[in-house]
């Protein structure tokens, strides 16, 4: 591939779209410092995938986008494109078929970076793959930037090895090996996970097998329990149906009796209704008489109100007449007063008009004399301003002369200080100590050894972290399992305690016990403990005595003869302690199995259980009948009793069955929970220890990493110090020459400044005298101007005083006119008010004449007579109503007696309805339960008919259901999906076994692949090392005119060893390359780069001022070598050296005529020479 064009747009200083042609094998880039030449090298690195901003001389990747200038706005994006001629098909991969390849990268302000190949968007990895093994890349040896020559020759052996690998083309092998190692690591992790899963699955299979057996037992018990439960429901459904029918018949008879009683009630209600109608008629008569009385009272009240109104109106009109007469007199007096004040105001108005005319004349005279005075003041001010301007010019010139003197003095002082600094710097300037350089080289070697040791320690710690983490996970899993076991036991205990508490709530006895204040007494079973397994036997023998209540004296129970308990209840009195009687030979008394410490209680139970013995099973109990004493019985653990003449099978027949067994299980569970809590605490402690160990290892990794980073920084700092000292030696001579030149320039500048100061001092003295004269004239003008200003101010004050007097006189005249108008309005108002009051007084006289109360007095007497007659009629009507009310109350009491007789009948019907409803609800409940389970009643009835007789007894079925329920409860928590989970786990184990074998095979295959890659890489690296070493040995003498150079390995294993450069120029026997000068290092690095090129020529090479440290002779040899190598490789170089420019076939000039914007000018050297020859 050959580079033909480089296109830039918005990249750093190349804001405008710019095309840099590369038509030949040697293209030089020239231009002044800072014009943007090195930006071309940065652009090539950037488009090849450089992701580190510092390698592009920036702080962030956004810095590559043009950031604006004085006349330009910032660019929105940066774009760089490289165009290659691929006519020979040397490109890798799918791009080998294209004759031209264009690689482009675009970065926008939002941080989006995109790569394109022939306008197809690709990944950064794809760009890397195109140039893999060619030496091209963001960090490849084909791009040599400023300072890279020194970094290359002074690189550590591990860093130099990278260039050798790139030249050998083993990058693709390393990439393949890295991918293979990643796959191998993933495969091993997968294998570890599979093995962990298999171990866990093995333990899980053992648990599932046990759980599957429990699930099988559970399903068998559940099927048997469901069958008996269905039979129980069917029997109860039939019983509830029969009960409902009986209650329905009784309810019909009670309804008939109720209807007969209701008929008698209706007859009495009819008689009551007739009497109530008569009572209503009498009440209406009373209301009518009451209404007539109300009308008479209203008429009396109306007439009395009319009389009172006439009297009140006459009094009110007489008071108003007196008030109007007084107001008329007051208004007449006010009219007289207003006429007198109007006459006085008219006299004042005439006097005020004369004073106003006089004040106006004086103000006009003062106003006419004021302009002349103000004109003299303005003339004096203008003269004074002219003098002030002249004075200011003189002062400005004087200040300028003084400033010139001060500036000259300050510059002379600064030059003196600068001379002292430069002389001090010249005295202190010295070259670095060579011993220090040797010491730094030794320190670097020691630091590298420490770094290797720290890296090994870090690797060991990082390997321990997964082990500690796995141990922590195992401890956490164990602790979680123990916690689950503890939770299971606690849940079982809580359920049993709740059940025990529910049973202890006494049921039907609870109200009776509370009524007799016996609810707080403890039950006997709470004090009993027996050997495990014999709980049912003890309950079968004691029966209701299990829940007996202790009393001090049994005679106290006589009080319950009239109010007996609603359910079975026993009381006991504690006897005195007595010795335990001896048992017959070969028989074990049931009382001997009790674990009781109270001797009185043991005496009581010995009495109750005195003739009860034990046998392990029913067969042995039957066999022991012959040995039983008279009246004795033998009991088995299930509770069945055998005596000499009978066998009694035991079944729980109350809700309190199993109390003793549950109590003992509760106590056992409490002990198990305490033990399990200790186990759980130990497991949590183990988790804490594992967590602590993991944290210690994890925390130790960070300091180890920090130590590795610290040693790496220290070695890097030593390298930087070494490079700095070498550069300081080269720069010290140049700096001394510049200092001497600066001192000479300072002396010449001091002479010029002294002459300038003397000239400014003479001018200052002349201007000082002129300033004194101007200041004297200006002071006189100031005094004269102040006198004129005082005269003008006095005239203006006199004018203002006269104008104010004229204005006040005018205001007084207007005030008198306003007062006259107000008095005239008040006089007219008084006249109007007096006239209105006279009219109103005349109307009042007429109203008083019209008022007369004699007619109302006569009507009032007639109304009082009518009211007396109507009061008597109302009294007669009320007496009739009271008689009828007494009859109505008698009839109503009789009706109420009949209604009360209905209440017992209705209560009976309600009771029967509730009983019928209860039976119906019970029937519906059992029917719903049977329907919900989709039970076939006919088939179940037929099946029950074929069963033994006990299947048709509800008590037996109830006990069987309870027994099966207890057996199911004894199984504990049941995993019903255990069978399915067991089958799924077995299938999963078979799959994981197969997967484990596949992973083992894959690991062997990947390890073989890594060994093969290592073998091929080792062979290729060795061949490359030998070839590059030979080329290096050939090119070094060409560049130096003699001497020798070679490459050496730092270790025996070529896959891990670094590469060191050994170079000795002609006539030198230096032991290390760091003792060479800067120019010698540059030539050595150039020889090494070109040796790499001869092995694996890159498509093109970029050189950025590589010849800067070379003298003319070395530059010429460097140029000859580049020219000879350009036959194989295309060179694009940046240089300020004329000798290097001469070898270029084309020159690309970079300019910056517009500040901050780079532009190019391309020149073909051969064409230029031909044009010059033709012009000559």
UniProtKB/Swiss-Prot annotation:
Keyword tags: ATP-binding, Coiled coil, Cytoplasm, DNA-binding, Nucleotide-binding
Signal peptide positions (record): none
Gene Ontology annotations of biological process type: chromosome condensation; chromosome segregation; DNA replication; sister chromatid cohesion
| Residues of the SMC hinge domain | 521-623
Superkingdom of source:
Bacteria
* Gene Ontology MF terms: ATP binding; ATP hydrolysis activity; DNA binding
Q: What is its main location?
A: cytoplasm
Q: Belongs to which family? A: Belongs to the SMC family.
Its assembly, as annotated, is: Homodimer.
State the protein's purpose. Required for chromosome condensation and partitioning.
Protein name per Swiss-Prot or TrEMBL: Chromosome partition protein Smc
Originating species: Bordetella petrii (strain ATCC BAA-461 / DSM 12804 / CCUG 43448)
The organism's lineage is: Bacteria, Pseudomonadati, Pseudomonadota, Betaproteobacteria, Burkholderiales
Which gene does this sequence derive from? Answer: smc
